Each structure stands twice: as C-alpha cells, then as structure tokens.
A protein has these predicted regions:
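Cofactor-binding loop segments of dinucleotide-utilizing enzymes, especially the Rossmann-like FAD-
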Residues: 1, 24, 125
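Catalytic nucleophile loop
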Residues: 2-5, 148
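Rossmann-like dinucleotide-binding cores of NAD(P)H-dependent redox enzymes
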Residues: 5-60, 140, 158-173
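FAD-site-proximal beta/loop scaffold in flavoenzymes
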Residues: 63-71, 76-149
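Mid-to-C-terminal Rossmann-like scaffold of FAD/NAD(P)H-dependent oxidoreductases
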Residues: 126-211
Length: 211
C-alpha cells in the first residue's frame, strides 16, 4: 500500500488481472498521508477495480511448484498465482545494535550524522535523523555531503531534507512533502485544511512558528 505497491498494482491491473492489495498498516501510503487523505485514495484505488486489505500482512506463501495462495496474519487465505512484494525500506540495525549504538527505526544520528559513538557516522537509508528515516536518493546524497565535510574538518550541519513524493498512477494526483501530518497531533505543528469532497480535493498544510 505504499508508492511501489500502488504503482505495481495499477500496472498489473492494465492486463485485466484480479488484484488484491495488502497493506500492513491501517491505511494506504501511511508514511505520507493522514487518515482523511488515505481514505480518499482508498476510494480511488477501489474505483480502479483493485481490492484493498489494510491492517494485515502476508504470513506465508503456499503452493507446489508455484504459489497458489497467500496466508495472512488475520487467518485469511487469498488464492493467488502471482505475488509482488513491495516492502519498501527497512533499515538493518543489527550491527549498530550489537555495537551498542542508539537505534530507533534506524541508526540514530545527530546534525553531523554522527551516531552515539562520535567516531562512527551513518548516512542513507539506515540512518534516522530527528525521528525520520529517508528512503529516497536525494536525502542520502545530502547526508553524504555533510558527513564528508565533517570528516574533512569543515563545519557542516544536516537540517533534514524535504521528502517529497508524488503518486502518478491514479486519476487524482497525490503529493506529499515535508513532515508527516500525524505529527500535528503532538503539538509540534499546526495545520490548515481545505476540503472539497464533491470534487475529491483535500489539502493539508502544516505550519510551525507562524510559517
């Protein structure tokens, strides 16, 4: 139910195949969208003829010589002859954990990309900065530039990246950038919301410190 999964499902649907999209979280594109936006996307996906199951996940694949069914965590079994796995980015923190470095969703780093050990740096998809793990190329390159400068003795700070994503396969354009909208519930951000249900429009702008 993330970007890759939705794009793959839409591509397969063009061949008139029966598609079931299984998402482990409680909504589609949970890393980018709030509940309201995800519900609108859910409707668009179903209108394309795709079945959607949320808050569940694959437990096992069954079949002889080829897959015949998928067993889900909920106990359901889905008949299948093709399975596409689009799990996205999951940082491997095993080495950092064994080394005693602080970890969260990824290896925690400060503004200089240093880990809990100041002589060890982490960048890219394994690093967690200010609670965020970036799964895109551009933030990884920005982190690399900062880490290289610090290692070379040049003062530099990483202040986070604008993590923008756009879904291009649905009739309704979906775009998200910046902080996750759920963070407004913590009080760190305020939000301005525009809704036009008749036309399927929903916009949410997060703001902090008056901007």
């Amino acid at each position: 139910g993330g970007l890759l999964g939705l794009e793959a499902a839409r591509a397969m649907r063009r061949f008139n195949t029966d598609i079931t999209l299984v998402e482990h979280s409680d909504r589609l594109m949970s890393r980018q969208l709030d509940i309201t936006a995800a519900a609108l996307l859910h409707e668009q996906v179903r209108a394309l003829g795709l079945k959607v199951i949320v808050d569940d996940g694959a437990l096992a694949l069954h079949g002889r010589h080829a897959v015949q069914s998928v067993a889900l965590r909920s106990g359901r079994s889905l008949p299948a002859d093709t399975v596409i796995i689009a799990t996205g980015i999951v940082p491997n923190t095993a080495l950092a954990l064994a080394s005693g470095l602080p970890i969260g969703r990824g290896i925690k780093v400060d503004d200089q990309l240093r880990t809990g050990d100041p002589d060890i740096f982490a960048i890219g998809e394994c690093a967690e900065h200010d609670g965020v793990v970036y799964g895109l190329v551009a933030p990884c390159l920005e982190q690399g530039a900062v880490a290289a400068s610090v290692i070379a003795g040049t003062p530099a700070r990483y202040r986070g990246s604008v993590d923008g994503t756009r879904l291009k396969v649905m009739k309704t354009t979906v775009f998200a950038a910046g902080a996750h909208p759920d963070r407004s519930a913590t009080g760190a951000f305020g939000s301005l919301i525009f809704k036009d249900p008749a036309n399927g429009h929903y916009r949410r702008l997060l703001h902090a410190r008056g901007r």
